[in-house]
Amino acid sequence: LVDIAFTGLPGRVAAGETLRLELRIRNPYPYAIRVGADDTQLVMLWKHGRFRVDEFPTGETFTIPADSELTRGGTFTVLPQLAGETFDVGFALRREGYTNWFNGKSVPTEVGNL
């Protein structure tokens, strides 16, 4: 399983706030993985409770070399629809037609209003 660890996400954020995150993506497979091309996308997941998962494609395009680790920076602006809730936040590689879940440890984050 590809592991995606990240830093830069505080425990409490506000809607409208721009987050600057650093992702460390580990590819354990003997082949490169192309992200943002074909059907594989990097998405940020915000999970609240058992049934709500908001998924936001990052739009990033890159290749993770075989059996290696890649570090990338990125930004995300917290959307108003997330305000007033606490989420488990993480990243996943999504392939069209497949269910996805966190590719790494999620981080609890509370989203407040502006």
Region roles according to the model:
Residues 13, 30-37:
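A short beta-turn/strand-edge loop motif at beta-sheet boundaries
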Residues 1-14, 111-114:
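Low-complexity, acidic Ser/Thr/Pro/Gly-rich terminal tails and inter-domain linkers that flank the onset
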Residues 45-61:
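Short beta-strand and strand-turn-strand segments in soluble, beta-rich domains
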Residues 25-29:
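Asparagine-centered strand-capping/turn motif at beta-strand->loop junctions
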Residues 17-21:
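Structural beta-strand segments of beta-rich domains
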Residues 77-84:
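Short, surface-exposed loop/turn segments at beta-strand-coil junctions that are enriched for proline
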Residues 60-70:
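Short proline/glycine- and polar residue-rich coil/turn motifs
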